[in-house]
């Protein structure tokens, strides 16, 4: 039919009251009895319900959509059906109105299939979009910033952690070094003695004319030697004349072998023993007012090579000798009362000390000196060793538990023994920070000269002391976090330049190289010189060129970095989080949990204690935990992520010999001639330069590759492509849900009121 017939039927809607009464009767009748209602579809007979909306007349549209037809008067189920039909005709989503307005079943079926197909495609593409979003992909943006980069903090350490002259006064260190000497002696076997035999075999067979047999004692080798004062039985005066004659013959033979004789000088390390053996007792004796109660000269050197295994019988044969545990040498020896306890200018790694040294600087070391001015480091706190007791029992006189704790048993490789000895030096953790700082190098002793940006540094103010468990006292330049230092230009002249002095003559026997250790880090980060440091040798100018890269990482869910700050178990308080610090914290927590004490190399939380380095049980537990973690970085027990913000310094190292022969100037506090100071600093000093190679730095910034905005754009595109749905269309569905929920609640509330009224009515009728 034409739309005019529809308008004719529409006239029935002009009077709503009459229409509702005519079609539905009483609106509330459905609550009282089952009444068959005439639906809109039946009313319009053969006309499609949607055809009424095809009229282009604005008045008709107004009446149909907004006007006088009230769906609230319909029964609940009919009202819902009417509401859904209204939504189908009015929604802006594609396909749904075509299904609702379909003139027949076939037409509707085609549109249903098309709609379902589009929904399937929408699902597949939407799933792909969501998967891409859930992958949390990120991109790295690299920018080159042409700006002055902040200068890093520089931590400087001496490769020798503690002064041998002072550290050997600590009983535990002394015992550790003694065990180390014993292990080195066993590992080396009789190599030195075999070498002497080879020399004798290759020597000319024609003996020199002599009136008595020659008993040549080989020259003592300083490598590995370590002197300490010890009591021994000796032969003095006429008792030791035969040995003295042998010694004179030995010195006479050496005179034929050596044309030039030099006194001992710490500036000439290769000849230091020559000077020690060439002293002349008569030239160095001083007039001590000592009464010779036994008829002998108490200032005279005594002999103990034949008697050192025997216990002294009295005052006349009780001497103090310079004893070396590794070679069992006891020489020189003088009567007990002739040694003088005093202070020496320098003491080297062999505990041999000298007085009145022109190149010496800093504090003096306690020592004990013989009348010949042969001096040995000695603090006087522990009595000298009894040599006869030591030699009769050998190294086993040491506590077996202590030897086991040191871990030298069964070791035959000298390099491994030295490494183990370095590890054992964490025994110093039993001392307070103040004591460890006192035993180590001071900043004034290590840093002689310093400049930054071409201007002199204030060594006391610009360097902060930091006690490291491996390197002792270290000193950090640019430690003030409130001051931002920058280089005004690139190149070594505008960076940090330091003249350092290591005093190699006072090195520990466990220190293998002379020089300094340099660590470059952010001032907020804890320095780890044993892991990230660079070594700079003496006798060279070491140039470290820097390039800075700043990393900015995304936290979860895009990345796996740790936000600014530190984790709860981080043991390096007042410092920012780092991966190395995390691993060490994890290891320390594991040790504290299973060993009931902490590794002495790392800090412990408040209330915890460090393990005793001499306790074999604690050492076994520490070694077991180390093996469990595969070193310090066992990933299966410790999970440490990168920090979200990090500064990475790339270092380029280049050395050159230093000082040059033309550098004829007084360096540091050297009081000798320019040539002597030049040679002295070549063995004990170094020049260190740290600078930026370019005044720019890289910024590496992570950002999300596919964010929420991208998700909305792609998802909205898929909705529009396959279903023609926009954000407003989604709002239509939301309102549809809210309206149907409201109608359901309203209907249930009406039923509730009806039941309540019926119940009240029954109660009222029952009371009459």
UniProtKB/Swiss-Prot annotation:
Q: Which residue stretches, if any, does this entry annotate as coiled coil?
A: none
> Where, per UniProt, does this protein localize?
Membrane
Protein name, per record = Degenerin mec-4
Membrane disposition: Multi-pass membrane protein
Q: Which GO terms describe its molecular function?
A: ligand-gated sodium channel activity
Pfam assignment, any one: Mec-4_10_cyt
Q: Which residues cross the membrane?
A: 110-130, 719-739
How is the quaternary structure described?
Answer: The channel is probably composed of at least the mec-2, mec-4, mec-6 and mec-10 subunits.
Q: Which residues lie on this side of the membrane: Cytoplasmic?
A: 1-109, 740-768
Annotated GO biological processes are: detection of mechanical stimulus involved in sensory perception of touch; mechanosensory behavior; negative regulation of turning behavior involved in mating; positive regulation of detection of mechanical stimulus involved in sensory perception of touch; positive regulation of mechanosensory behavior; sodium ion transmembrane transport
Acidic residues bias located where? 243-252
**Key word Transport present in the record?**
yes
Q: What does this protein do?
A: Probable sodium channel subunit. May be needed for mechanosensory transduction (touch sensitivity). Negatively regulates the turning step of male mating behavior.
Q: Give a yes or no for keyword Membrane in this entry.
A: yes
Q: Which residues lie on this side of the membrane: Extracellular?
A: 131-718
UniProt superkingdom: Eukaryota
Region (Disordered) residue ranges read 187-221, 237-260
Could you tell me where the Basic and acidic residues compositional bias lies? 189-200
Q: Where is the composition biased (Low complexity)?
A: 203-212
The entry assigns this protein to a family as follows:
Belongs to the amiloride-sensitive sodium channel (TC 1.A.6) family.
- Which residues, renumbered to this chain, are glycosylated? 336, 357, 480, 484, 503, 671
């Amino acid at each position: 039919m034409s739309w005019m017939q529809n308008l004719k039927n529409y006239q029935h809607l002009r009077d709503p009251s009459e229409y509702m009464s005519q079609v539905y009767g009483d609106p509330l009748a459905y609550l009282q009895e089952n009444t068959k209602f005439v639906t809109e579809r039946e009313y319009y007979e053969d006309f499609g319900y949607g055809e009424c909306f095809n009229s282009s007349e604005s008045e008709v549209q107004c009446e149909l959509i907004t006007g006088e037809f009230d769906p609230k008067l319909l029964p609940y189920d009919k009202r819902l059906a009417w509401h859904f039909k209204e939504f189908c005709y009015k929604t802006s989503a594609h396909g749904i109105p075509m299904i609702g307005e379909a003139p027949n079943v076939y037409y509707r079926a085609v549109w249903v299939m098309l709609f379902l197909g589009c929904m399937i495609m929408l699902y597949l593409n939407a799933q792909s979009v969501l998967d891409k979003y859930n992958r949390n992909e990120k991109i790295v943006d690299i920018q080159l910033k042409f700006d002055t980069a902040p200068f890093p903090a520089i931590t400087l350490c001496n490769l020798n952690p503690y002064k041998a002259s002072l550290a050997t006064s600590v009983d535990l260190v002394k015992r550790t070094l003694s065990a180390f000497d014993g292990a080195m002696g066993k590992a080396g076997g009789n190599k030195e003695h075999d070498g002497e035999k080879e020399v004798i075999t290759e020597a000319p067979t024609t003996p020199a004319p002599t009136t008595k047999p020659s008993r040549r004692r080989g020259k003592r080798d300083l490598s590995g030697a370590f002197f300490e004062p010890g009591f021994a039985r000796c032969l003095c005066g006429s008792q030791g004349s035969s040995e003295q004659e042998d010694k004179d013959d030995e010195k006479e033979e050496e005179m034929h072998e050596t044309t030039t004789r030099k006194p001992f000088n710490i500036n000439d390390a290769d000849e230091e023993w020559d000077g020690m053996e060439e002293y002349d007792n008569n030239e160095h004796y001083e007039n001590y007012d000592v009464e010779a109660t036994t008829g002998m000269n108490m200032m005279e050197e005594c002999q103990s090579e034949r008697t050192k295994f025997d216990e002294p019988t009295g005052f006349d044969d009780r001497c103090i000798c310079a004893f070396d545990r590794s070679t069992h040498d006891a020489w020189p020896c003088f009567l007990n009362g002739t040694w003088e306890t005093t202070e020496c200018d320098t003491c080297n790694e062999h505990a041999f000390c000298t007085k009145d040294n022109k190149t010496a600087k800093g504090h003096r070391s306690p020592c004990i000196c013989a009348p010949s001015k042969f001096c040995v480091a000695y603090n006087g706190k522990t009595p000298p060793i009894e040599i006869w007791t030591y030699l009769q029992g050998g190294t086993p006189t040491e506590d077996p538990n202590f030897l086991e704790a040191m871990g030298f048993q069964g070791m035959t490789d000298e390099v491994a023994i030295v490494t183990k000895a370095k590890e054992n030096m964490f025994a110093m953790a039993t001392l307070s920070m103040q004591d460890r700082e006192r035993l180590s190098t001071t900043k004034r002793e290590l840093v002689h000269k310093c400049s930054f940006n071409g201007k002199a540094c204030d060594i006391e103010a610009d360097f902060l002391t930091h006690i490291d468990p491996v390197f002792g006292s270290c000193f950090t330049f640019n430690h003030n976090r409130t001051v931002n230092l920058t280089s005004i230009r690139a190149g070594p002249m505008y960076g940090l330049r330091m003249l350092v002095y290591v005093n190699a003559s006072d090195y520990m026997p466990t220190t293998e190289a002379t020089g300094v250790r340099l660590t470059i880090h952010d001032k907020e980060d804890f320095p780890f010189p044993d892991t990230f440091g660079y070594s700079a040798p003496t006798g060279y100018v070491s140039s470290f060129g820097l390039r800075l890269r700043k990393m900015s990482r995304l936290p979860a869910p895009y990345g796996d970095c740790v936000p600014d700050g530190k984790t709860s178990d981080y043991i390096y308080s007042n410092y920012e989080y780092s991966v190395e610090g995390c691993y060490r914290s994890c290891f320390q927590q594991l040790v504290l949990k299973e060993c009931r004490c902490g590794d002495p190399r790392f800090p412990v939380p408040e209330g915890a204690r460090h393990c005793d380095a001499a306790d074999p049980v604690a050492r076994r537990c520490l070694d077991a935990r180390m093996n469990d973690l595969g070193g310090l970085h066992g990933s299966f027990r410790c999970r440490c992520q990168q920090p979200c913000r990090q500064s990475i310094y790339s270092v380029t190292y280049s050395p050159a010999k230093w000082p040059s022969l033309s550098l004829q100037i007084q360096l540091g506090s050297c009081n000798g001639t320019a040539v002597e100071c030049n040679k002295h600093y070549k063995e004990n000093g170094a020049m260190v330069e740290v600078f930026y190679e370019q005044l720019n730095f890289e910024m590496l910034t992570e950002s999300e590759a596919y964010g929420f905005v991208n998700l909305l754009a792609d998802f909205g595109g898929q909705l529009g492509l396959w279903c023609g749905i926009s954000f407003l269309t989604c709002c239509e569905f939301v309102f549809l849900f809210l309206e149907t929920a409201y109608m359901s609640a309203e209907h249930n509330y009406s039923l509730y009121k009806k039941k309540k009224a019926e119940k009240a009515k029954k109660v009222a009728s029952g009371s009459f």
